[in-house]
């Protein structure tokens, strides 16, 4: 697929899925994409177990026909002949086989639809030119300037200093953990919308990020957030520390605007958080750079 076509798709077609389908899935208080994963596991498990049952039933029927045919030939004193099939197969087994074939055909269609959705909402986005090639989020002055090691060192020190200063302003409990009553999900959504006012590529509708019910599983995979192409949702791991949540949520929301590369999403998440008036979001932005 040509980068030009991919870019056209992201600019003119991909936003339609978020504006329509994303609004529908956004009405649900839970992650629709996560429920789809559960359903997929159940459908696959049923197909496997059903197939095993079919194999066992066929094997038992085959053995019984062989034994019956052997006894019949022995009773006539003749040589062993090929046992007859067809009518000896139970009717319920034939019905079960037909149902299994229909179910398998249904799953083939499901897999085909899944592949189509993954192509349109994920794989195709990887063909889009990078933000560097498109010269997004960069001023002409910065583009013409060459940065050396001294300037990068100064930037590093500035990030660390700002993170340390913000750390002192965070509200903490008796154990020293940072606490906040801020609605991080809605704030992340608002910050991305504000960023969209500055950069047209990020403008438009943003659904509210969803919490993952199986956060423990995602923690084992070292996953802080997940973009579900099947439901156009931004999801996040509720077990991550509170200072990681703002940058993670903005990161996942950026995927809904066609920025599928992780480093680009990290950068956009940083921009959204560092420009926020909420100190927790600013702190999360600087920590995401340090990490």
Segments predicted by a language model, with ranges:
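Membrane-embedded alpha-helical segments of integral membrane proteins
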Residues: 1-62
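Active-site recognition of the HExxH zinc-binding catalytic motif
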Residues: 29, 247-259, 263-266, 270
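Perimembrane helix-loop junctions in membrane proteins
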Residues: 51-65, 69, 122-136
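Membrane-interfacial, low-structure loops and terminal tails that flank and connect transmembrane helices
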Residues: 54-100
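Internal/C-terminal transmembrane anchor helices
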Residues: 99-126
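Membrane-interface segments at or immediately adjacent to transmembrane helices
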Residues: 123-193
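Auxiliary, metal-adjacent structural segments of Zn-dependent hydrolase domains
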Residues: 168-238, 242
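Post-HExxH zinc-binding segment in Zn-dependent metallohydrolases
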Residues: 260-291
